[in-house]
Structures are given as C-alpha cells and as structure tokens.
Amino acid sequence: MGTPSYDIKNKGDDMQEEPKVKLHHEKGGDEKEKIIEKETPSQDINNKDTISSYVLRDDTQEIPKMEHEEGGYVKEKIVEKETISQYIIKIEGDDDAQEKLKVEYEEEEYEKEKIVEKETPSQDINNKGDDAQEKPKVEHEEGDDKETPSQDIIKMEGEGALEITKVVCEKIIVREDLAVQSKPPSKRDPPKMQTDNNKL
C-alpha cells in the first residue's frame, strides 16, 4: 500500500516538472521581448547617424557664407568709387579746377582701394566668419572717421591732424597742473582759520 503512494507522489513530481518546463518557455518569451528592446535602441543609433548628417549640412552652409561675405566687400568698394565720382561732378564748376581736382581725386581713389584690400584679408584671417561681417560694417560707418581718414589726413592734410593732437595734450597738462596746485593750499588754509578762531 505504501509503494503505490510513493508512486503517486512521484507522479505528482512529474506533474510539477511539466509546469516548470512551461515556465521556462514563458521566460524564454520574456527573453525575446528583451531582444526586441535591444533592437529598438539600435534604431536610435541610426537616428544619431542622421543627426550627424545634419551637422555636415550645417558645415556646407557656412562655406558659401564666406563667399557671400567676400562679395559684400567688393560691393562696398564700388560704392566708395561712386560717392567720390559724385563729389567730382559737384566740383566741376570751373574749367581750371576740373583738371587739378580730377588728378587729386584719382590718386585718392587708388589709395583707398589699396587700403581696403589690405584690411579685408587681415580680418578674414583672424575672424573668418560672422565676426568679419560685423566689424567692417562698423568701421565703414564710424571707423572711417578714425582710421582711414587719419591716414588720408596725414598724406593730404597732415597739419590739421597734428594740431588736433597738440590741443588734446595741452588740455591734459593744464588739468594736471591745476590739480597739483589746488591740493597744497587747501591743506594749509584750514589750520590758519582754526588758529584765528582760537585767538578770538
């Protein structure tokens, strides 16, 4: 009687083993799901490749910008020539003045063109990009009054430029002298007033 009872228990163990095998299959299904999860990030890696391609497109856009900037400098040179030609038309009142003034303005045109050509490559080497656009525009508006005319004034009107610098230096010296002279008397006067008050 006892032996069949053990056989029944053994059969029970076999029945327990079968669901264990089924559980293993279910776990195998979970592993397949994990593999699918691993495949999804691989698609994200492909998306990263597309992002890198966009970066390359950005680089290609920057190169034509350099070309457009250089074209802008050439256009500015042409505008400077046109403005000078307008001044010549205004001065063309006297026949004698035409010949003399034309020779002077032609020399100025050639000098200004050379100065602009020397400045633009130096800026392109240092900045190469968007900074080169911003600085020359500011120099053409305000910088011309400081840099290019200063060179022209030294060649054409050197005396006027020297007089301006002399006046600035004289003003600075006068301010320093007044400041030095005003300090010692201010220190000496108050003690005299105090002694007078004490005597009274």
UniProtKB/Swiss-Prot annotation:
Sequence repeats lie at residues 3-8, 37-45, 80-88, 117-125, 145-153. Activates a lipid-based signal transduction pathway in which linolenic acid is converted to jasmonic acid, a potent activator of defense gene transcription, including proteinase inhibitor. Residues 1-178, 197-200 form a propeptide. All organs except the roots. Transported out of wounds to distal tissues. It is found in: Cytoplasm. It comes from Solanum lycopersicum. Its main location: cytoplasm. Keywords: Cytoplasm, Hormone, Repeat. Induction: By wounding; in leaves. One of its GO terms (molecular function) is hormone activity. It comes from the Eukaryota. Residues 1-33, 106-159, 178-200 are annotated as: Disordered. One of its GO terms (cellular component) is cytoplasm. This is Systemin. Residues 8-33, 111-140, 146-158 have a biased composition (Basic and acidic residues).
